[in-house]
Amino acid sequence: MKSLIAIPLTVFLFAGSAQAYGPRGHGLVGAVADKRLAQNKPAAAAVKQLLEGLTLERVATLPDEIKAFDACGKRPSTKPLKVPKRVNDELMAFLAANPCSGHPSHHEFHYTDVPVLGGEKYAGGKVGRSDFDIVHMIPFCVRVLNGEEPETNDRGITKTVAVILLAHYLGDIHQPLHVGAEYFDADGNPFEPTTDDPGLADQGGNKLTLFTLVKGKEKSAGKLHSYWDGQTVENAFGTLKTSTIASRLSKNEPENWELAGEPDTWAEQMANEILPVAREAHDRLDFKRIKEKAGEQDITSGRAEERRQSGGTFYAIWAAATVKEEIHKGGWRLAALLEASLQ
């Protein structure tokens, strides 16, 4: 295996929010896969036909775009997506089959919340998992593509929608906070939940405000989850164009990217692989001012403060290097998954 390629790690140690992993991070995963898939003409032709000429880079952001179409508690949008009519119609049918107000909701398909405390693997417990989380939905899409699951399924996932979802979910499952979550007891202390005592979840970091160290001082970096979705990508790749990054990443084989077994087993392998990273993403932080509300299953707010380490790597630098590696693997794995599923 070759080592990660020499794209400069451009880390700016400042606070701030950026675009979500969707627009740039997801696009990068798709763009790398586009380059890789181009080397397999039959698979590339099949994907092109299903997507009516759209690239994986483009469609990788669509699942987040339709999340915004029916944001919970708001009136669903009827505005068509900027995609071919058939693709739009199939995505809208998928949306209707899995509405925000229903169960399952397509919002649930993007993540799983395995507790980071305790060393569990995905199959080692039940807290934070569901039959409709990302570890279940990736193989569902694989089965649609290989014909094991009919396109007339209850989830409204056609082969076209399956490709679109996989282009996105392969990015999500390589983002550590889409797989691992912190849980707290009634006193606001991290703890290992059980089915009898599930505690209070942090929604994959969505309820925690991150404070990183900048020149020795704490500065707010926004919500912990959003930081990993967006700022880490900007820190990792700076102002380099997507085409430049994708070209370099697609030509250099990432370390330890290949997975064993059938494609419908890969999601659980990827989840188990990213869980130690999710644990470190939390272990590097101290949690303070954790607040809860009676009757709620999640915390309402809290602080996640970077720990001061003598001679250690800053959180921002470590996170950016991690995201660069995960996007690299995600792109190669997306191409391999589509090739294997469309044989």
Identify the residue ranges that each predicted region occupies.
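Sec-dependent signal peptide recognition
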Residues: 1-8
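Hydrophobic core
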Residues: 9-13
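N-terminal signal peptide c-region/cleavage motif recognized by signal peptidases
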Residues: 15-17
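N-terminal, motif-rich segments that launch catalysis or mediate targeting to/interaction with membranes
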Residues: 19-167, 176-343
